[in-house]
Amino acid sequence: MSLSPVIFSIGPVSIYWYSLAYVLGIVFAYWYLHKLDNQKIFTKNFYDSLLTAVIIGIILGGRLGYVLIYDPVLYISNPIEILKTWEGGMSFHGGAIGVLLAVIISCRRHNIPIFYTLDLISCGVPIGLLLGRIGNFINGELFGRVTTMPWGMVFPESGDNLLRHPSQLYEAFFEGALLFVVVNSLFYLNKMRLYYGATTGVAVMLYGVARFMVEFFREPDYQIGYLWFNLTMGQLLSIPMILLGMLIYLGALNFRFNTKSIQ
């Protein structure tokens, strides 16, 4: 399977599918945040501040997370490569930390409840993940392990001619589409939004579970390989996410979110 990562080029400037995926994900999350904030707690100044901070958090956190966790040697020897975000190489875990810091800073500055904001953001984030994984698929990166299944694909970046799981599409479905449906269904149908931080906890926990399971079909990063107990780096990073999500959810059950006194 070989798809061009470039949508089109105008002179020396190229527009990449991967970059477009990030832009569309952020635009959707921004629009969806407006839609979910039916109490109009957020002001225009807060939206603008949050959007700017989140974009910076995603780019810096995602890129630095990938550089420090997955391939520090390469980027130390070729630091200019750190700037080439359009070629892929973004860490969800690093990006999540960047977004968290962005939300905390923006909420503190505008006196907006942090977990209320995180809950609403958690409802829209899976669509960004879905689009990002499709971008990975188009780039032909983060491919799966060798398989004999009829839907196996050959990825030129693997350096061989073997059929592999299209694990990027598995992640797009489980970490993106399915997570979006489940989290939003719980948010609306089970009144989870009445419990401060519950949606955030569930989203973090379910993402960790989905990522841990899909990693069994994804080829480990060549520079890292398998680690403790034959697990991948992605799986090891997902374990604390699952535990953290559970703690946030259980903690939220003890502090019911009163929508009439949200401040």
From Swiss-Prot:
Keyword Membrane: yes
Bilayer-spanning residue ranges: 6-26, 50-70, 85-105, 112-132, 169-189, 197-217, 233-253
Example GO BP: lipoprotein biosynthetic process
Localization, UniProt: Cell membrane
PROSITE patterns: LGT
GO CC aspect terms: plasma membrane
Main location: membrane
InterPro entries: Lgt
EC number, as in UniProt: 2.5.1.145
Pathway: Protein modification; lipoprotein biosynthesis (diacylglyceryl transfer)
A Pfam family per the record: LGT
Sites where the protein binds a 1,2-diacyl-sn-glycero-3-phospho-(1'-sn-glycerol): R133
Swiss-Prot/TrEMBL keywords: Cell membrane, Membrane, Transferase, Transmembrane, Transmembrane helix
Role noted for this protein: Catalyzes the transfer of the diacylglyceryl group from phosphatidylglycerol to the sulfhydryl group of the N-terminal cysteine of a prolipoprotein, the first step in the formation of mature lipoproteins.
Family: Belongs to the Lgt family.
NCBIfam families associated with the record: lgt
Protein name: Phosphatidylglycerol--prolipoprotein diacylglyceryl transferase
Gene symbol of the encoding locus: lgt
